[in-house]
């Protein structure tokens, strides 16, 4: 006697047996008999969801817990950086000693990355003020502005000390008069920041630097070197001309029979 209303048929296409005590697959939620309830027996397509494996640290052979959906490589890497007790991991931990001070971040870096506003240490991902919610006040001077200010300080220090070329008497020849360039005194560095923004101060410093690099009047030593070079060139040309004349005036020893 059959009871078609009792139990359920096996979902395996090759079986379809009526089982009074059917079993439900916890992966694909299919109904199967006792012979096909295993994942491998009915070729379950959702068996990978139940195949949970715990990765093992390759250095200390300790199982590393991994949250669902998290890549195991990331969990193993964080374990090596923080909790691994092996010698290579501890040696690496001594190198990466600069811990990020942002809340919730455990990244460590080899060098310090200090914020210019709050003077705190952060990792590469959180080094910008917007990435770590910087609480520092004020707008810091950029590196270009600092470089321009340092150049202006160097120009101001060198312009106050008289150079040896200014103290020496000018050697002017009667046929050639040299003009002395007017002395230029750089304004103090404080004037760069007095009432000027950072961009204006940078532009002012660049103009001062370009003014310092203008070509100067040649010195006496340069004029003497130039005259000596011209004299040597003229003597060489005269010697070659005399040699050419002597060769042309020399009689030929060849005779025709």
Curated annotation (Swiss-Prot):
Residues holding Zn(2+) 4: 115, 118, 132, 134
Entry's induction text: Down-regulated by the miRNA miR-125a-3p in myelo-proliferative neoplasms.
Modified residues (Cysteine methyl ester): 254
Chain positions with Phosphoserine modification: 163, 173
UniProt-listed Gene3D superfamilies: AN1-like Zinc finger
Zinc finger AN1-type: from-to: 4-52, 94-142
Subcellular location: Endoplasmic reticulum membrane
Annotated Gene Ontology cellular component terms: cytoplasm; endoplasmic reticulum; endoplasmic reticulum membrane; membrane; proteasome complex
Molecular function, one GO term: ubiquitin binding
Extent of Polar residues compositional bias: 155-171
Motif CAAX motif per UniProt: ranges: 254-257
Residues holding Zn(2+) 2: 25, 28, 42, 44
Record: residues binding Zn(2+) 1: 10, 15, 33, 36
Domain UIM: 197-216, 221-240
VCP/p97-interacting motif (VIM), as annotated region: 141-151
Lipidation (S-geranylgeranyl cysteine): 254
Region (Disordered), start-end ranges: 153-187
Annotated binding of Zn(2+) 3, by residue: 100, 105, 123, 126
Domain of life: Eukaryota
Membrane topology category: Lipid-anchor
Role summary: Plays a role in protein homeostasis by regulating both the translocation and the ubiquitin-mediated proteasomal degradation of nascent proteins at the endoplasmic reticulum. It is involved in the regulation of signal-mediated translocation of proteins into the endoplasmic reticulum. It also plays a role in the ubiquitin-mediated proteasomal degradation of proteins for which signal-mediated translocation to the endoplasmic reticulum has failed.
Domain notes: The UIM domains specifically bind 'Lys-48'-linked ubiquitin polymers. The UIM domains mediate interaction with polyubiquitinated proteins.
Protein name, UniProt field: AN1-type zinc finger protein 2B
């Amino acid at each position: 006697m059959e009871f078609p209303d009792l139990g359920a048929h096996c979902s395996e296409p090759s079986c379809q047996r009526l089982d009074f005590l059917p079993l439900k697959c916890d992966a694909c939620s299919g109904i199967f008999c006792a012979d096909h309830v295993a994942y491998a027996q009915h070729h379950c397509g959702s068996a990978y969801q139940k195949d949970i494996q715990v990765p093992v640290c390759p250095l200390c052979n300790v199982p590393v817990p991994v949250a669902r959906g998290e890549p195991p490589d990331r969990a193993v890497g964080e374990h090596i950086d923080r909790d691994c007790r092996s010698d290579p991991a501890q040696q690496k931990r001594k190198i990466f000693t600069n811990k990020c001070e942002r809340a919730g971040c455990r990244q460590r870096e080899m060098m310090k990355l200090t914020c210019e506003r709050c003077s705190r240490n952060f990792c590469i991902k959180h080094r910008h003020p917007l990435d770590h919610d910087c609480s520092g006040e004020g707008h810091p001077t950029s590196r270009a502005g600092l470089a321009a200010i340092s150049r202006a300080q160097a120009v101001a220090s060198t312009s106050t000390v008289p150079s040896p070329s200014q103290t020496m008497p000018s050697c002017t020849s009667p046929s050639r008069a040299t003009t002395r360039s007017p002395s230029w005194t750089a304004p103090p560095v404080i004037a760069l920041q007095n009432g000027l923004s950072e961009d204006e101060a940078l532009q002012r410093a660049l103009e001062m630097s370009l003014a310092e690099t203008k070509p100067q009047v040649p010195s006496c030593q340069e004029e003497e070197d130039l005259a000596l070079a011209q004299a040597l060139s003229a003597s060489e040309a005269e010697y070659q001309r005399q040699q050419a004349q002597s060769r042309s005036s020399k009689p030929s020893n060849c005779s025709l029979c």
